[in-house]
Structure formats: structure tokens, C-alpha cells
Amino acid sequence: MNQNFQKEKNLVLDYYKALDKAEGDEISKVLSSHIGKDYIWRGFHPFNEQSDAEELSKVFWQPFRHAFKNMQRRMDIFIAGKNQIDGFESVWVVSMGHLMGLFDNEWLGIQPSRKMAFLRYCEFNKVQDGKITETAMFFDIPHVMIQVGLTPFPPQTGAHLVQPGPMTHEGLLFDEQDAAEGEKTLASINFMVEDMRDWKHTNELPLVDELRRSWKEDMIWWGPAGIGATYTIERYAEQHSGPFRASFKDRISNGHLCKLAEGHFGGFFGWPNLTLTPTGGFMGMPATGKPGDMRVIDMYRREGDKLAENWIFIDLLHFWKQQGVDILERIAQNPRN
């Protein structure tokens, strides 16, 4: 049996079409005509939460579009589904990819390159009664910094690159999908989350064997700038999962606000998902003794009964600011570091 989220998908696609061609004050009008009452927008630091179309346009969209000329939305994943977190009541539409443009003007203290630049993004939109009532738009600002030659963090353990979409090139689900496939994907995501929630197998299984319970051997972890991307279970364990687990204490799971799947793709976001205290070593940073929140989006591709790819968006600027390190301030003070 197919799931039909065509109405919600088309609404979001129409919104993107209008937003992406709007300029200046037109952006506010597009936002106002598509968002509902009591709207809330959640974005990464320094934008955080916004609830007014005019303010969202002024604070985020207009400055970004002024900096990134001739912007193109290059989607790699487009799905919709019902939210497991509220008992499968609400419908959300998810878009992931890059916003590409000519980086011609300063943005957030980052000096322009006058060359192509890509902002990694993933956006969850809740659709109710013909309007978008809630948005989580997470994006990788440090990735833009690295593209223009800045070094916001110490050397990362994974690879830096403009990240591609799914290996299968089948992430744009504009049409109806078999509901059973989405259920399988959600089950695979849930199994993985529960299996590692307390890192409970650390003393029972080698990390690579624990990961094999959820992941394909040739899995790809597309991590954010500052951590980087890694390929195969063994390299993922070596270059991210192992160091990450060893670098924190007092790990608290705060849960998610939305979790859904459609076809072979799915994901979730939280605000925040995790609270952790650094013990030293993560991203080359020292221990602070301060708990910090991580706002995260995870998107997945399933293959068979296991996960094959994972795209991750972490608000590292927000996390490190809580630890006393203001990356944006550093960049503004030393724009050609």
C-alpha cells in the first residue's frame, strides 16, 4: 500500500520555488504567505529560534541571499512522512542537499571568495492545514569557512569534501511510495538508536562488532565540518565513533522532536538531542567540565535491513560557544586565518 503525502510535498515544493526566486523584501512576502499562525523556525547558531516572517527574512534569508548570489537549491533527498514522536499524527516534509551560489559578499564575518560555495543544509517542515507551521533548518557554517580557506577547528579526523547525495541517486521521492519500505527504514533507524543509546555494548562487544548490528560493512558517515566524512565500519570506528565515545561523560539523551521515514530514507532532529560534558580530545579541544547541548539532524539511507549512509548536521558553533569558544568571533577578528 502506498503512502500519499503529495499535498504536503507539493506545498513545500511550491514554497521553495517561490522562495528561491524571491529577492530582497519579496522574501518576507513569500514567507508570510506560506507559514501558519504560531510558526516556529529553528536554525543553527547564531540564528537560533525565529517566529516572525519579517524577522526570519531580515535575520537569515536576506543576508544569506545577499552573500550567495544566484542561489541554487540542489536537493539530494526529498521525503515526507508521519512523525513517530507524536504518535504518527503530524506530517513533515524533509529536504536535504546544498544551497549553492557565488559567494560574493561577506556573511557572518566570513569574507567572500567570489567563487562557487556550498552550504550543506537539511530542513524539516511540518505541514498543517495548507501551511508550514514549524521548521527545523540545520546548516553547516564551518563547512563554508573551510571552503574559503579558513581553519575554524583543529585538523579533523575525517575527510573534508563537498558531500554527495545517496550512492543510489534515488533520494528525491516526489511520487507516492510503498508504506512498507518506510516502515522497514524506520525500524532500522530505531534499532540503531536503541542499540547505542547507552553505549551499553562497550564492555561486551568490540565497537566494530557492535556497529555491524546496525550498519552495512561499507557504510558511509557524512559528518559535519570539524569531524568530516568516513567510509567503512572500521574507519568509522577509528575516525569518529571511537574518539567520540571516549571524549564525553554524563551523556544525556534528550530525545527528538521529529522522526520519520519514507522509502529507503529517514531521519530525525532534536532541540537539543544530546547533552554531554567534554573530557578532552573531541575535535582536538580540551576538557571543559561544562555540559553542552548538541542540536542534531541525522538522515539515513537503508539497504536491506541495515543502514548504508548517514548525513549528520551538528550545531558545533553552538556547542563550542557553550564551552567558551566563540568560533564566529574568532573568524571576525581574524578573517584570513
Describe the predicted segments one by one.
Residues 1-337:
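C-terminal and inter-domain tail/linker signature
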